[in-house]
Amino acid sequence: MEEHSVGPLVPAVVKPEPSKNFSTDTTAAGTFLLVPTMSDLDKDFLCPICMQIIKDAFLTACGHSFCYMCIITHLRNKSDCPCCGHYLTNSNLFPNFLLDKLLKKTSDRQISKTASPVEHFRQAVQKGCEVTMKELDTLLLLLTEKKRKMEQEEAERNMQILLDFLHCLRKQKVDELKEVQTDLQFIKEDIGAVEKHRMDLYRARDRYSVKLRMLDDSGGRKSRHSSMDLNSSGLASSPLNLRGGLSSGSHTKKNDGKSQISSHGHGIQRRDPITGSDSQYINQSGLALVRKKRVHTQFNDLQECYLQKRRQAADKPHGQQERDTNFISREGYSCGLDDFQSVLTTFTRYSRLRVIAEIRHGDIFHSANIVSSIEFDRDDDLFATAGVSRRIKVFDFSAVVNEPTDAHCPVVEMTTRSKLSCLSWNKYAKNQIASSDYEGIVTVWTMTTRKSLMEYEEHEKRAWSVDFSRTDPSMLVSGSDDCKVKVWCTNQEASVLNIDMKANICCVKYNPGSGNYIAVGSADHHIHYYDLRNISRPVHVFTGHKKAVSYVKFLSNDELASASTDSTLRLWDVKQNLPVRTFRGHANEKNFVGLTVRSEYIACGSETNEVFVYHKEISKPLTWHRFGTLDMEDAEDEAGSYFISAVCWKSDRPTILTANSQGTIKVLVLAA
């Protein structure tokens, strides 16, 4: 995707004005000296060229004095006096010794005014000031004592700094030790709780196995007794009924045989799930090994997740802890452990994405193939696609999955004037779908007539995103490159609200729990969270992305996921206005690659032509799937040419619709 944002100007740093009384001069040694200026000295002491105190004064034939280097440099370019313009050459320059002496004395006086007593003493000694041996001894004693005191103070300061450092280090390590000890206590308690729960499960399994064996044994005895009774009654029958009795007896024996076989077979069938056959045991053992391997692969992230949840549970208010105590006594688990078990279960449940259906671009698309948006309808029965082909195509999901063909025909198809960027189904009116296009037009379509119900043309540039409200089916919101967010109502032609964002709008999304709140992602790298009842300023601006925010999606009323062209996803808490987690693993630097959320899972595309799935509690990918191509010529350039362009979860199961820039659509499902 292209960024058109104009970044904020960096404020200019205002430099402080130099002092009017002194100017700074840097010596060769790099020290700064205070040099007197015109307020302290007569202007005649200043060189007319450099406007500083004259150094190595030279006099011209016309009577003006300059620094030697200043006048020599001037005469290399011009042959006149800088003051009066009189003709002048190097032969007309003469050293001005008197002025040099006067300037030197003036400079010495200025230095003496600002010099320290030590500097005065040093200058006096250098000038040959006579000092007696006794005076020198006294001075040496004073200097020695002064040096000793300074060394003592320096040593004390160093010791104090070292001691402060060691105290800080000790405090830090003690805090870390306390934290580790607390964590170890959490782990010890949780190990005990898990072991107890596991033993309870084993005992329950054993009790159930014994009960099944008892039922099987009693069933076998009953069948044998009934068989003996029937046989004895047949033998005691009259001769007239002997044939019938025999036939009846033989029939009964046959039925009993079937019953015994059936009962025996049924008994095996019921025992297998409990005792387990060898193949089942091997499969279960292999699955356990795979899950353990996945745990070790993401051990650091899982460890962080566990400790975070346990610490949060321990830091809860007293009233909340009492409720958690009731939970612990009832379930045997702490609240934090229960939360982590849920994370661990959902994280290790799946390890790959499996393709269950595919629609080839060559059969349903033509010259333009990029699928910009793919969305399920309210009941997940239908899904719609749109993109640069200027068509909205609606497919029957069950037909796509169950019919073994790559070329599926849409059940509804609508043609548009412009390329499409986004789709949004109405969550109440099943036959309504909204679209945004490259001309900035937002259109509401009806499936029954296959025509537009409303067209909104207020956007001045390309509209990137549109979204229906989940709580009010008549409201929808859109965002555009014209830097405006517009709220629409299907009952009126003009926009209801207009928010000027001062930056290109890439995505908009309603909060699923309230029609008053929207999240807006823009090219200024930020997410603006607005309350539509007061649009003068956002409720909060979430910062952290380094480039434009291309997608925003709500996992819940309080959790917001965002995608950016900085190759990261981020999770935010819109209730506490805090960042929660950053996800890395996919590549996304310029294109819209799609973002979709479902319960604990977040999925997005990548510019490597791969689909990535993340668990919301783990910052690294859960799994990923690479789109392949059947064309060998395309296979070489696939990694650099194609990218995932749209993704969408099915709400009732771990199934995801994916599409790429080649126009290929795949139905993927999370598998173990």
Swiss-Prot record:
Main location: nucleus
Ranges annotated as RING-type zinc finger: 47-85
Entry EC number(s): 2.3.2.27
Pathways involved: Protein modification; protein ubiquitination
Gene3D superfamilies in the cross-refs: YVTN repeat-like/Quinoprotein amine dehydrogenase, Zinc/RING finger domain, C3HC4 (zinc finger)
GO MF annotation: an example: zinc ion binding
Residue ranges of WD repeats: 366-405, 415-455, 458-498, 500-540, 544-582, 585-624, 639-671
GO cellular component, one term: cytoplasm
Compartment list: Nucleus; Cytoplasm
CLS (cytoplasmic localization signal), as annotated region: 62-172
Coiled coil: 129-196
Catalysed reactions, semicolon-separated: S-ubiquitinyl-[E2 ubiquitin-conjugating enzyme]-L-cysteine + [acceptor protein]-L-lysine = [E2 ubiquitin-conjugating enzyme]-L-cysteine + N(6)-ubiquitinyl-[acceptor protein]-L-lysine
Motif mapping: Bipartite nuclear localization signal: 291-314
Region described as SNLS (subnuclear localization signal): 115-172
Region (Disordered): 216-279
GO biological process, one term: protein ubiquitination
Alphabetical keyword list: Coiled coil, Cytoplasm, Metal-binding, Nucleus, Phytochrome signaling pathway, Repeat, Transferase, Ubl conjugation pathway, WD repeat, Zinc, Zinc-finger
Bias kind Polar residues: ranges: 228-240
Domain of life of the native organism: Eukaryota
Protein family according to the UniProt entry: Belongs to the COP1 family.
Task of the protein: E3 ubiquitin-protein ligase that acts as a repressor of photomorphogenesis and as an activator of etiolation in darkness. E3 ubiquitin ligases accept ubiquitin from an E2 ubiquitin-conjugating enzyme in the form of a thioester and then directly transfers the ubiquitin to targeted substrates. Represses photomorphogenesis in darkness by mediating ubiquitination and subsequent proteasomal degradation of light-induced transcription factors. Light stimuli abrogate the repression of photomorphogenesis, possibly due to its localization to the cytoplasm.
UniProt name for this protein: E3 ubiquitin-protein ligase COP1
Source organism per UniProt: Pisum sativum (Garden pea)
Gene designation per UniProt: COP1
